[in-house]
Regions:
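Elongated, amphipathic alpha-helical interaction scaffolds
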Residues: 2-267
Length: 267
């Protein structure tokens, strides 16, 4: 959604809905509201996920610096496989540097999940960015690891039958049925919110439209959107939550002003 400027007397006057990154670290941690995040993740990845818990890493702390709008989630897919989902909302122009090591930090921060450790199937690193990020014609990008042969470029490294069972818990009979070795490595999704300038045609488009405009069209039917209409209203906040949200919005204005000034000076 558009970042308000100091010209606005009330930073929250533009929308009746709460900004997603603030809600993500606070309201959406409530189990009653998990449907919102689950709906967004399902719309993006194309598989149904159920949140098991929020991982209490340092970056998940609710009182951390506002610029680190970041949560780590342990979730289960429809095949009962556990995955870790890292979701970041960012306004930093140096974001490529953070993205480079973020997924690795998620893994090291949460390497000891007790009985769940061996069941973690995948890490998804989801990045919602609100600034000019790289160059490209699309507004959603998907990155993943593929191992190609150096001397046989058409050859892709695959897991062996035993590795497939050991690492993924899947039994296969034929070598041709084993997955790519890249399946063991994190996948990245980048949503360049400000580059979305069209009518929402898919459930994911509806979510991105909400991220950009701060508004939820009455016709939107994406997974989780109906619950978002109910729990993300500004007028539903308590007095304490309202004060915290106002402080967050004011910090957002200041941070963007400082970043843009530094960017213009070539810093």
């Amino acid at each position: 959604s558009p970042i308000v400027t100091h010209k606005d007397s009330n930073p929250m006057a533009k929308s009746i809905y709460i900004r997603f990154e603030w809600a993500m670290k606070r309201l959406l941690r409530d189990k009653a509201n998990h449907e919102v995040l689950e709906g967004f993740i399902t719309s993006l990845i194309g598989r149904k996920f159920t949140i098991v818990k929020f991982l209490e890493s340092e970056s998940n702390a609710q009182d951390s610096d506002d610029k680190f709008n970041h949560v780590d989630i342990l979730a289960e897919n429809e095949d009962k496989e556990l995955v870790i989902l890292e979701i970041r909302n960012e306004h930093e122009y140096t974001y490529f540097h953070r993205m480079r090591y973020g997924a690795s930090k998620v893994i090291t921060d949460n390497i000891n999940l007790g009985d769940d450790d061996g069941r973690v199937r995948k890490v998804y690193s989801i990045h919602i960015v609100y600034f000019e990020f790289g160059q490209g014609e699309d507004y959603v990008y998907h990155g993943y690891t593929t191992f190609k042969g150096l001397h046989e470029p058409h050859d892709t490294l695959r897991l062996s039958i035993s590795e497939t069972e050991r690492f993924l818990g899947v039994k296969v009979k034929h070598r041709a049925d084993t997955p790519s070795a890249g399946e063991l490595f994190p996948e990245y999704y980048v949503l360049r919110v400000n580059d979305f300038d069209q009518t929402a045609r898919t459930p994911l488009d509806e979510w991105i439209s909400f991220f950009k405009t701060g508004d939820i069209n009455p016709d939107y039917k994406a997974p989780g959107m109906e619950r978002a209409r109910q729990c993300l209203r500004v007028d539903s906040l308590t007095k304490e939550e309202y004060a915290s949200y106002f402080h967050h919005m004011d910090n957002l204005v200041y941070a963007r002003s400082a970043l843009e000034s530094a960017f213009e000076r070539g810093m």
